[in-house]
C-alpha cells in the first residue's frame, strides 16, 4: 500500500461542488466511485487540497489517497477509463504523513467580460489587494481568521476578456469571486478605488459576488512534490 497524490481537472457545471453532500453529485463522490471501481475499496483515505463551490472549475486541484496499485501511470489511466467528468492528469507518491492541504501556493483565474473595462484602473485595483489585508468584507465569513496575504493578482487582457490571475497560499470562502466583482466594478467605472480601500479598511461596502463558472482553480503547487 502506498500514499498517492494526483492532480485532477473537472468542469464545475457537472457537480454540486467538490465536497461530498448527501444525495448530490459532487467531485468527491465521483472520485470515490472511480477509486472504488479500480482499487476495490470503500475507504481509500481520500483528501482534497482545495474545496471548490458549485459551478467552479479546476484544471489542477490535488487529491491524496491510498493505493494498492504500484504503477501510478496504470492507475491514472484506469481511473480515467472509468470516470465520468473527472480527469486524472498527473501523480506522485507521497509519505504517509504528508498533508495534501498544506500547499505552497494556489493559482486561480477569473475571466471577466472585457467590454468597457479600463485595464489601467482594473490593474490598479488589483494592486490594492496584494499583500496582507483583513479580507472580512471580501469573503463569506465562516468563522475562520480573515487576515491573509495575496502574493499577486495579475490583470491580463485576452481577446474580448480580461483574466485575473490570483496567486496565494490559501483563500477565504467566496473571496476570489468578491474581489473579481470589485475589480470589474472599478474597471467599468461603477465603483472607485477609494470604495475598495474603504472596504479593506473595514467599511461595509458591497461589490457583489462574481458568478462561479468564470472561476478556475488552475493549479495547486508544492515545493517538495514533483508531479509527472
Task: Please tell me what each predicted stretch does.
Residues 1-228:
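Structured-RNA-binding interfaces characteristic of tRNA pseudouridine synthases
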Amino acid at each position: 500500500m502506498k500514499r498517492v497524490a494526483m492532480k485532477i481537472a473537472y468542469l464545475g457545471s457537472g457537480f454540486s461542488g467538490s465536497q461530498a453532500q448527501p444525495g448530490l453529485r459532487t467531485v468527491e463522490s465521483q472520485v470515490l466511485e472511480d477509486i472504488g471501481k479500480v482499487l476495490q475499496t470503500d475507504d481509500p483515505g481520500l483528501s482534497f487540497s482545495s474545496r471548490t463551490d458549485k459551478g467552479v472549475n479546476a484544471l489542477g486541484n490535488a487529491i491524496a489517497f491510498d493505493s494498492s496499485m504500484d504503477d501510478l501511470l496504470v492507475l491514472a489511466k484506469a481511473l480515467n477509463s472509468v470516470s465520468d467528468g473527472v480527469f486524472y492528469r498527473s501523480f506522485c507518491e507521497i509519505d504517509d504523513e504528508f498533508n495534501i492541504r498544506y500547499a505552497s501556493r494556489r493559482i486561480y483565474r477569473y475571466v471577466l467580460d472585457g467590454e468597457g473595462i479600463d485595464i489601467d484602473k482594473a490593474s490598479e485595483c488589483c494592486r490594492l489587494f496584494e499583500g496582507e489585508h483583513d479580507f472580512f468584507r471580501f469573503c463569506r465569513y465562516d468563522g475562520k481568521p480573515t487576515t491573509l496575504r495575496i502574493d499577486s493578482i495579475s490583470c491580463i487582457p485576452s481577446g474580448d476578456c480580461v483574466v485575473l490571475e490570483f496567486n496565494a497560499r490559501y483563500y477565504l470562502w467566496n473571496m476570489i469571486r468578491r474581489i473579481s466583482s470589485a475589480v470589474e466594478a472599478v474597471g467599468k467605472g461603477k465603483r472607485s478605488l477609494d470604495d475598495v480601500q474603504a472596504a479593506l479598511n473595514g467599511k461595509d461596502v458591497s461589490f457583489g459576488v462574481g458568478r462561479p463558472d468564470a472561476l478556475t482553480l488552475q493549479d495547486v503547487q508544492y515545493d517538495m512534490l514533483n508531479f509527472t
